[in-house]
Amino acid sequence: MLLGVNIDHIAVLRQARMVNDPDLLEAAFIAAKYGDQITLHVREDRRHAQDFDLENIINFCKSPINLECALNDEILNLALKLKPHRVTLVPEKREELTTEGGLCLNHVKLKQSIEKLQNVNIEVSLFINPSLEDIEKSQILKAEFIELHTGHYANLHNALFSNISHTAFALKELDQDKKTLQTQFEKELQNLKLCAKKGTKLGLKVAAGHGLNYKNVKPIVKIKEICELNIGQSIVARSVFTGLQNAILEMKELIKR
């Protein structure tokens, strides 16, 4: 299984002080050496990664670059100019802390944007909710890749197997008894398995990501149809204590098949 290392949260740390440290390019070199792919989300408001980050990483890193971006003309034109290995189209809201759900596949610009990217040999992935309907739509749209949103799975795992319910970060919708949470967790995991199988059957390459960490990744690794995981925040958080190289290698060991 391949690991895409999302380095957005290195940029978060840099932007917190609006200085040039930590150096995102240095992080990209480490991610390229020990991971399989660099994933970077250039948001419309540029709150984390900047255009020059993407350009530098594409110019100087040998690793495949997976650009996450919304259906935004300015950023799509940047992608067409710089030509990352892949573009993963994601939904985006200005007020969100992180990507909250899968892409709306009925967006009028979506098909046209996919074709433009593919015409310059950029692979296209769609970040989607794990639903059979969205997988079928992705195949109709002729995307090469889908990335299944694992956020709900991750939230359920956290509610079941951590102390988050006793903290300010608890989710109100998951304020339920353990038996109910366990049932929902098993249902969501089974749904991810069915979606991965469906995607593969339709000829799509299947990735997964969002909220995955060192505690919850193992059940996802067992879904053989998923060929790649894109993981960022948990790796960067671990790197504060272990260093980025060790944090990546630790995750690589966990996802080894």
Swiss-Prot record:
- In short, the EC number is 2.6.99.2
Which pathway does the UniProt entry assign to this protein? Answer: Cofactor biosynthesis; pyridoxine 5'-phosphate biosynthesis; pyridoxine 5'-phosphate from D-erythrose 4-phosphate: step 5/5
GO:BP terms for this protein? pyridoxine biosynthetic process
Query: What class does this enzyme belong to in the EC scheme?
Result: transferase
Keyword annotations from UniProtKB, A to Z:
Cytoplasm, Pyridoxine biosynthesis, Transferase
What positions does UniProt annotate as the active site of this protein?
Answer: H41 (proton acceptor), E68 (proton acceptor), H210 (proton donor)
One Gene Ontology term, aspect cellular component: cytosol
Top-level taxon: Bacteria
**Assembly:** Homooctamer; tetramer of dimers.
Provide the function of this protein. Catalyzes the complicated ring closure reaction between the two acyclic compounds 1-deoxy-D-xylulose-5-phosphate (DXP) and 3-amino-2-oxopropyl phosphate (1-amino-acetone-3-phosphate or AAP) to form pyridoxine 5'-phosphate (PNP) and inorganic phosphate.
Similarity annotation: Belongs to the PNP synthase family.
Name under which the protein is recorded? Pyridoxine 5'-phosphate synthase
